[in-house]
Amino acid sequence: MRDELNKGLIDFLKASPTPFHATATLVQHFEAAGFQRLDERDTWAIETGGRYYVTRNDSSIVAIRMGRQSPLTGGIRMVGAHTDSPCLRVKPQPELQRQGFWQLGVEVYGGALLAPWFDRDLSLAGRVTFRRDGKVESQLIDFKLPIAVIPNLAIHLNRTANEGWTINPQNELPPILAQVAGDERADFRALLTDQLAREHGLNADVVLDYELSFYDTQSAAVVGLNGDFLAGARLDNLLSCFAGMQALLNTESDETALLVCTDHEEVGSSSACGADGAMLEQIVQRLLPSSEDYVRTIQKSLLISADNAHGIHPNYADKHDANHGPKLNAGPVIKVNSNQRYATNSETAGFFRHLCMAEEVPVQSFVVRSDMGCGSTIGPITASHLGIRTVDIGLPTFAMHSIRELAGSHDLAHLVKVLGAFYASHELP
């Protein structure tokens, strides 16, 4: 099971270089399992035992498995994750021609570790909006090939590079695509028009706009002398999206279950398709049209917010509280923060610990050092919007927000197992 899941995750990561592609890949899996698309602009006819999914902005998805028992009776089991990761996004007017090179201006999306982006084989993917035959259309594209690079400055020209180096994103991050002749003018939109034709056979009249991100073309892989680790881009948080999908598709229950994978978590979630927007609340309200039933059901429900946790790094162990250093391959981590940066409380943590014990899955705890700030997740946001009880958990990870992150190769199976038990559980606290 472990090897099969790891291979599945590697394939999922390769197919999902952007939130748009991640959502499209999730859609493919759910449709293959018989889930039906619901359009938010249409009237819904929800059936007992039905399987559905809803997307918004092509970058967020909610998958729904209606139980044979009314959600008013047993509540709803929700798992939440996010589809976005820190990256470099192409600017609207990106063309730069300097010293005979064609470069693209980029904007840093989220809290990225910038140094690892240098000297990598980069490709480009995302969504393009264009006009064709007088109509506005959108399509996903992925160049797949390594078409760009951000070369480092040689140490001979930067003798203090290893003593600490502040990266200027405006000046130092524009990737190089090609060399150009002196009077040749690079045209990025023409490049996108050609890619639409090559990839989809579409003859666009004009490219109107785009949301495109650079990504590392190196595939994810199981690494380490004994294959102990899983290395790859976007583990935060496509690992949790994949685990939630596997758990939902491979469990049967009389209870209603949701997988919620939203965009824009890395930049605060405040968007129409983010956790701080109304998407999830509106969907659940349509499943439970009565306001009385909605409130009663939410109070019987529970959300597991799944997002990667900081594993204790052997070279930087002092960055963790000595009693709360999650180890790779030692199971999922319950995240706790007294200031509500995580939504976990004793009741929800106890229930998750109970699930892990019942499934013989190891479980750990994380609390940030008292002299350090704490990050947050979609957990507190969703808990406050819906009023739903929530536990924040995640798999321990090194190099979070780097271009290539590292997790334990045994932990994915642990997470899928306990999320499956949650979806199948007959009783919630």
UniProtKB/Swiss-Prot annotation:
Q: What is its EC number?
A: 3.4.11.-
Q: Which co-factors does it depend on?
A: Zn(2+)
Q: Annotated Gene Ontology MF terms?
A: aminopeptidase activity; metallopeptidase activity; zinc ion binding
Database matches in Pfam families: Peptidase_M18 (PF02127)
Q: Name one GO cellular component term.
A: cytoplasm
SUPFAM superfamilies xref list: Aminopeptidase/glucanase lid domain, Zn-dependent exopeptidases
Keyword Magnesium found = no
Q: Record's CDD domains? A: M18_DAP (cd05658)
Which residues hold Zn(2+)?
82, 156, 401
**Quick one: a GO biological-process term for this protein?**
proteolysis
InterPro entries recorded: M18_aminopeptidase_2, Peptidase_M18, Peptidase_M18_dom2
Q: Which UniProt keywords apply?
A: Aminopeptidase, Hydrolase, Metal-binding, Metalloprotease, Protease, Zinc
- Which protein family is named in the record? Belongs to the peptidase M18 family.
What is the designated name of this protein? Answer: Probable M18 family aminopeptidase 2
| Organism, scientific name | Pseudomonas syringae pv. tomato (strain ATCC BAA-871 / DC3000)
